[in-house]
Curated annotation (Swiss-Prot):
It comes from the Eukaryota. Residues 1-30, 85-111, 232-289 are annotated as: Disordered. GO terms for biological process: chromosome segregation; mRNA cis splicing, via spliceosome; regulation of homologous chromosome segregation. Belongs to the TLS1 family. The modification Phosphothreonine is found at residue 253. Residues 5-58 are annotated as: Interaction with SNRNP200. InterPro entries: Tls1-like. It is found in: Nucleus; Chromosome, Centromere. Residues 232-283 have a biased composition (Basic and acidic residues). This is Splicing factor C9orf78 homolog. It comes from Mus musculus.
Amino acid sequence: MRITGKTFRRRRADSESEEDEQESEEVRLKLEETREVQNLRKRPNGVSAAALLVGEKVQEETTLVDDPFQMATGGMVDMKKLKERGKDKVSEEEDLHLGTSFSAETNRRDEDADMMKYIETELKKRKGIVEQEEQKAKPKNAEDCLYELPENIRVSSAKKTEEMLSNQMLSGIPEVDLGIDAKIKNIISTEDAKARLLAEQQNKKKDSETSFVPTNMAVNYVQHNRFYHEELNAPIRRNKEEPKARPLRVGDTEKPEPERSPPNRKRPANEKATDDYHYEKFKKMNRRY
């Protein structure tokens, strides 16, 4: 009898190597992401002590400007170099113009540059270089003094610079998203404030209205004369009284004739002329107000 062993599935070497490669790639990607996050969290470096000790390197062009005719080295001048130097300056000016316009559009301020400028000015003051520069200034002519403005007329630009600095500092601060909950709370608070204002305005209107002062003065007080005058061309209407019939008696053969009022009849006390009636009506209308 031949004993057969059980067959088990075995992983191939290729599949194991592929899995190892995938795991290594995942680990590498995670490490790169963490490095990028760390680089973003890094604070920018300020002014280093080594840069302050070494100082700025003076370029050759600045030395040429200080001694353009090379009097210290014998007075030999190379005209080709002078022409090339002028061409380079034009290109540098264009580049500088583009850079300044871009920095003005971003509205951000380089704090390190301001710090370096402040340190340089303070060092010059301590060394006494500023006093020498002030002495180098040319004396002004009498005509130049005429164009100068007195101090009381000069407009101080300190306020403008302070406003510019504050705007630049605020533009550099990144905005933080507070979330949806904060926005919803702000909306609810604004709606409540609107409702309060509307309620206050309505209450003020109700308090201002009183029975003594009418709301519409024109309706209550304007009385036009056309309501008091009678129509001129209107036909005159008179109430004609029908004649009263005489009572019949026994033995009367003729028809009873209507009674005629005597010519000089006295009027009762209730009867008045139309002028008196309108006059009394006018007086009553004015008494109401």
